[in-house]
Amino acid sequence: MSHHVPNLYGTPIRDPHERKRNSASMGEVNQSVSSRNCERGSEKGTKQRKKASRACDQCRRKRIKCRFDKHTGVCQGCLEVGEKCQFIRVPLKRGPAKKRASVVSIEKFSSDNDPLQYRPRTHSYPMNSGNNYLPSLARNSSFPSISSLFVPSITAQSQQFVKVPYDDIKRRSSLATLGSDSSISTEFGGNYRLDENLNVRQEGKDIVAKGMITPVEEMGACSSNVRRQGSQSLPIQEQRASPYINPFISGRSRLSSLSYTSEATTSEGNTQGKNQCMLTPNSVRSIEKERLNSLTAGCPNKKLGTDGRSDKWDKNSTWKPVYRSSNPSHPSTEKNVSLNQEASAKPLMLGTYRQFDATSFYKVLGIYYNFFHINFPVIPINKSKFTDMLDPEKPNVIDEIRQINNEIIQCFKTALEVLVFCKIKQRRSSKSTKSWSRDSLCDFQKGLYYIQNFNKCIADCFQSLITIKPVLKQNSSVIPSRIKFIYFSTIIVLNFILILAGEESSLLLGPSVGVFNEFQAHKLFLPFENTSPMLLLNSNEESGDEILDYAVLFKRLYILLNILDTLQSFRLGQPKLINLNFGSAIETYFSDKTGHNQVVEKAPVALDNILRNLKLGEFITYFVLNRKSLQVNVPHHLLFTNQTDYGEFAVEKGEHDNIAGKFETLLKKKEILIRKLLNIEQKNDHILENCCNSDAEMKNIGELVCSMITLVSGILDSITNMNAENSVDLDSKPLPNAYFAQDSEEELMSPTQSITSNLASEENTRCTTKDLMGTVSIFMLPMVEECYNIISLIGPIPTTLISLYIRNGNMAKGINDRIMTLSTALNELVQITALFNTLEPFRKNAHDRAKRYYVSATSSTGCYESVMKSMYSGKCAASNASNVAPSEEENKKILKKFADIGWKLMDDSELGCCCCFFN
């Protein structure tokens, strides 16, 4: 029986003899005159136009030459700009209408012989709407090209188009999979189901049930048993309107679909989802390619045994399988989780493929330490120490926990890939794109895949961590602390990604705090003499230094989670989830005083910048915990007379020369300005008439406002010079060639370390803007939002004061100096407006953050009443100022307007810097 299998491009390929007999009936386009004259009965073959003979839709629209590459499936123009190469446009009909009889005969012949219906080639990523699992760098060394990601649409009644030979494979459940539906619906409208008539034993089905498989050549040998049942194919659904929008540009409720999956839900999903095969872009391409190779080579249908599987993988270094299975009958909520049962099947994920994916992963890890670690150490340990933790062949690691180790490391790699690939800056023609693709030509497509599936990748990775949690907790005494450190570091990385993207929900932050509390991480800060019984630390570790080392590392992770919680509370105005008072935790646990082995960063300049940013997070934590909105019932005289005691956070005379120091000073001066403006309206239970010297009040307010405008201008200017897009820019700080070496796994020196090695001997070891060029900071979005709100509120004050001074006609020497200072502030406001327009990601993410008002309180002129003023309206009722002198009347009105600005500044501090409030 002849084999009829489509190739990668959807074109049916038949037996050579049958192809010769039926070439005319199939409507093939032949160049020879004899083939064009061939007829089947009385019907003439229809001539079809090849895609290579016409331009794609994008090139036709741009009126440029379309250089289509049949190997990659993408033309050169679409590949450079990152667009989808499509041929959706239907050419206009020319000449007389074609005879319908020939078309009907071709369709009839194709339906009788073709196992898959003919479909035009489409270049796009399959956006699965079902529950599938994200590809990982350890599983796929070279990401598929765009042409390889075409998933043919199959009718709902059709069987699976490949029979996977897993008869001799016996495996147990895995840890990092969750339940899903029995069919996988794709954006193309097709459903992939397992063949109900496959002669496969139940042991093999357990692997296919919830697995993610990257097939190899031998899988193509089993394609002869495939049959087609349906006669019509479902139409291709319309693609996403903007699939390449970076999730870090717009962060408005992006994770609406992300929800915390409890252990009970996971168990229920595992019971319902049975006999599934997860299809990824790699698996679709490999299946089609290898089926074609096996057909043309005449490969016999043979089964693949367990013993010979690893040898065959080693022969092909491009495609290697990664098995992920889950036993549906094993509930994750069971109290006693057997470690031996979970690790009975030992998939050597990292051990087998370490050499295979070492180059790519170490490159991703190097990008993190160069562009992210210097501003916020999501992995609170230096690179050399953390690289040793990833070694699966560490001593004291028994075989039973190897599977847990591999699953946790795999989740960490996936999370780090999402962070790096979604934040890397892609340009049409830049040296960075060429250097990035040195290791793999398809890294660009990989980044596009993570951007399109951003929400799903984050959700699946976190669900995998939740699935591992029961086993990790029940066997905490035998699992090394380094594995638990990687596990909790992955949770920090996932929360870091969402907050960096500007996500305005806490659907992941709340469960993450719950996981830390479940492992009693907060007890590490209590003065216990013996910390060995804790879940995070192991009592069976021999070295006491190791216990002390990991105790400090776990404290760092909890402090980092507290800072991430603080940033969400600062932006959204919501209560903090962690209210533990850590004291001076940054200087205690992150400085080089903790020891050389567990130091966060070995480079002095980078370490100085890390400590400054973390201290800024510590100050914002103190700032958030002292909000007055949480003290609504406080007496009104205490509301204004009690000043926030910043203690060690007192305002210094000299301004800092870095962004973190400037922003900290800006927040302090903002609190001082709020107190001054509110004291104008109410001061010692008396009203405005008792303000004996309004001119002095205006002078103090003017000087404070001008200094704040100068600080905002300096902050925005530093951000623009450092990284206006807050994305990884390989042009400003290119990676060294050592990252792309194929046979090197030794520790690599980052550009930061190479730069700072010469600066370490100098007296000034502080990090400058030049050292931070191209780096990514999680504090930039809150900084820009806060600066935007402050400028929107205090911007009219200099103009008002200048007009008041000129109207009074008092041109004394002191007044002239004030007018000059206010005029300089106005010039800086113009520069600030231009800087806001330069910050493209923040400008797209901007909305009316400064307008927090009740709709009922809005007047016809557009003015709105402060939310905090409405809350304290009964305590701040002003009386009639009947004894005010006429000459002072205008000044008093201006001061009252300034008091309203103080209330609105208080709204910004108390209710968050990016939220709008409506009634």
UniProtKB/Swiss-Prot annotation:
Q: Which residue windows does the record flag with biased composition (Polar residues)?
A: 23-36, 318-338
The record's subcellular locations are: Nucleus
List the GO terms this entry assigns under cellular component, sorted alphabetically. Answer: nucleus
> Annotated region Disordered: where?
1-54, 297-338
Segments of the chain annotated as binding DNA: 56-85
Q: Name one GO molecular function term.
A: zinc ion binding
Tell me which UniProt keywords the record has, alphabetically: DNA-binding, Metal-binding, Nucleus, Transcription, Transcription regulation, Zinc
Keyword Nucleus in annotation: yes
**Transcription found in the keyword field:** yes
- Enumerate composition-biased segments (Basic and acidic residues): 37-46, 304-317
Describe the subunit structure: Binds DNA in a sequence-specific manner.
Please identify the protein, giving its name as recorded.
Answer: Transcriptional regulatory protein EDS1
Report the source organism. Answer: Saccharomyces cerevisiae (strain YJM789) (Baker's yeast)
